[in-house]
Amino acid sequence: SPAQSSGKYQWEITIGAKTTTYYQMGLNLSPAAYSTGDQHATFRGDGFTSSSLPGSWSGTPPSFTEGDVITVAYDADASNCKFYKNGVLGPTFTLTSIPGNLNFGVWADSNNGYASYSLNAGQRPFSYPVTGYNSLCTTNLPDPTIADGSTAMDTALWTGNGTSQTITGLGFSPDFLWVKGRTEATSNYLTDTVRGITKYVISEQTAAEGTNSIRITAVTSDGFSVGSHTSFNENNKAYVGWTWDAADSNTTVAKDANGTNLPGAECVYRANTTAGFSVVKVADPQSNEARVHGLSKKPDLIICKSTASSDSWHTYHSSLGYTKYINLNSTGAASSSNQFGSQEPTSTYFYVKSNTGSGANKSGGMIYFIWHAVDQYSAFGSYVGNGSSDGPFIYTGFKVAWLLIKNVDTSGETWTIHDSTRDVGNPAEHRLLPNSDGQESTGTSARFKDLLSNGFKIRGTSGEQNTNGETYIYAAFAEHPMRHARAR
């Protein structure tokens, strides 16, 4: 069961029979099966402890065997995990930092035997309750910051009428719109209220910003209007619009407003600090690094494009770090470069390379779409494929409404987008590609995945999502937090 990001929780493990040498349990970064190369903090049946997670063990670890009850008490706010044997405190592991989504697991110590365990997460009274700790169930999860994901990110579907129409029913007035035709080959059009909704950039192209008054013509309190352009409103054709809420008005931060080269260029932005999303326009990029993002936390995803000239889309992802980037408009693998400056983003600034020749800081103008993770609403991370139709499960803490995935190790694998509006049940099979103008496809079972109440599950073996041993980055947004979600 995944360790929560806040609160105090307990659960009990009753030790069963085994044929392997040792029982083993503990914390692990892998959402799938534990292996010796994973980052972990484990407690073994002979009393041995080990760790490759940042932190340390304290206390005296007892041995345990069949019939013993191990109580696990996890304090997310204090970043420690206590282990009790039959009600007596044993070892405690204290984390100095949390490098990813923690999981708790139980294992056998080899592939040549088995170890059995019985979990009590609160479905019956605990044998040894720990004062101040709650059972690990959805009722005891903390209240979410965003109780309904559709109030911050929403998906609209419509059928074209060939003239003009207004799309309604969103939970907000959208500030960032990503529109794609489903039933014919049309480009991915990205527009925003910071630049003005008649301006657009196309995610599968390197072309400069365009302007057209018959694509998106207006935004409303709960939607937007489209004109007669065939990429938005051809008669009887199907379309999807993915939308995000930023803010009601632009904020301008002058160059050097916060000190020398902070920021290094004037930044105009709209930011939704609650939902962790902002749109930043830099009309006159400078030969320095710092830019303001308007959010309260370090960004996890930055997608950017030169607006004045032809150039690729450069993407920062926190799982890759600032020394690497990947192009949204191509099937290429991640590349090492200084496109995102000489340091990681902070809670105030993001960084770009210090010259304006190309990429994430090209002269003439830049647009940046920026997100950070919000507990129970958005998640950004990575996973490693296993090449099996029983692929990795990735915990997000919410019912997934929208999912973006990309292989970062191998060239030739496409970006993919799935959402729960186009696929109301599992498996999710209707995919669209940010790096292609192709129409919606269902593909084969090798591309299937499940969008679940607490994450997503890879169901296919395609290289675009599950090559054995290769790394994939993802971005996911919530329909509802896990506390309020129901299975699809």
Task: Identify the residue ranges that each predicted region occupies.
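A sequence-level detector for low-complexity, Ser/Thr- and acidic-rich stretches
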Residues: 25-26
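Catalytic cores of Mg2+-dependent Asp-rich isoprenoid enzymes
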Residues: 11
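Conserved "boundary/linchpin" sites in short secondary-structure elements
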Residues: 21-22
